[in-house]
UniProtKB/Swiss-Prot annotation:
Gene name as annotated: pyrE
The keyword Transferase belongs to this UniProt entry's keyword annotation: yes
InterPro entries: OPRT, Or_phspho_trans_dom, PRibTrfase_dom, PRTase-like
GO biological process terms, semicolon-separated: 'de novo' pyrimidine nucleobase biosynthetic process; 'de novo' UMP biosynthetic process; pyrimidine ribonucleoside biosynthetic process
Record organism: Nitrosococcus oceani (strain ATCC 19707 / BCRC 17464 / JCM 30415 / NCIMB 11848 / C-107)
HAMAP family assigned: PyrE
Binding-site list for 5-phospho-alpha-D-ribose 1-diphosphate: 26, 72-73, 99-100, 103, 105, 125-133
Name of the protein: Orotate phosphoribosyltransferase
Length: 220
């Protein structure tokens, strides 16, 4: 685990985005942790989150020309990431996002921001649960004459969905692209291993991974 990944986990705990305990997920599955990126809800926290995304993206080596944020959660994320890539790495990357409703006046269309045609596009989102927003974004990107280069998310839960694959693995297999995450389940476990006072939570996380976990293919 890289130092920035450990810092991200500490940051997420501090903001109560990441909590350890007993939680029931939408799927009905019992989970020993809960991750709610909506609590990154201030200017300072969003700016810092953008820097973590920029670090993960830059470290991945992915080639792209445009960032894309799926509405609605992806819009502040893609904006913060574009700013961080400029401020931290000197990369002035265009960004775009989609509307949920089509406008018939003004600039019109479903995509707002940098034109996508001919570009390699990296989607920036919070997590991939069912993969719905990523698939919708991929359809828009391809319809605009662009190429999907990959997806960047904050946390990869590394757990099976309905089948043996995780939602992340399903997206990677369907589109033949890598999904980059700031952190993943393995990193959460390593973080807890360094905290003896969190042993009860560590045991639950390890048991959860044993029951539902999948290995990451792209895990820098």
């Amino acid at each position: 685990m890289k130092s920035y990944q450990n810092e991200f986990i500490k940051f997420a705990v501090e903001k109560r985005v990441l909590r350890f305990g007993d939680f029931t997920l939408k799927s009905g599955r019992m989970s020993p942790y809960f991750f709610n990126s909506g609590l990154f809800n201030s200017g300072a926290s969003l700016a810092r989150l953008g820097r973590f995304y920029a670090q993960a993206i830059s470290g991945s080596g992915l080639a792209f020309e445009v960032l894309f944020g799926p509405a609605y959660k992806g819009i502040p994320l893609v904006t913060a990431t574009a700013i961080a890539l400029m401020e931290k790495y000197g990369r002035d990357i265009g960004y775009a996002f989609n509307r949920k409703e089509v406008k018939d006046h003004g600039e019109g269309g479903k995509v707002v921001g940098t034109p996508l045609k001919g570009a390699r596009v990296l989607i920036v989102d919070d997590v991939i649960s069912a993969g719905t927003s990523v698939r919708e974004a991929a359809t828009l990107i391809h319809a605009a004459g662009a190429t999907l280069a990959g997806v960047a998310i904050s946390l990869d839960r590394q757990e099976q969905g309905q089948g043996k694959q995780s939602a992340v693995q399903e997206v990677e297999a369907q589109y033949g692209i890598p999904v980059v995450s700031i952190a993943c389940l393995d990193h959460l476990i390593r973080h807890l291993e360094e905290k003896p006072e969190m042993k009860e939570h560590l045991d639950k996380m390890q048991a959860y991974k044993k029951q539902y976990g999948v290995e990451r293919v792209f895990n820098p």
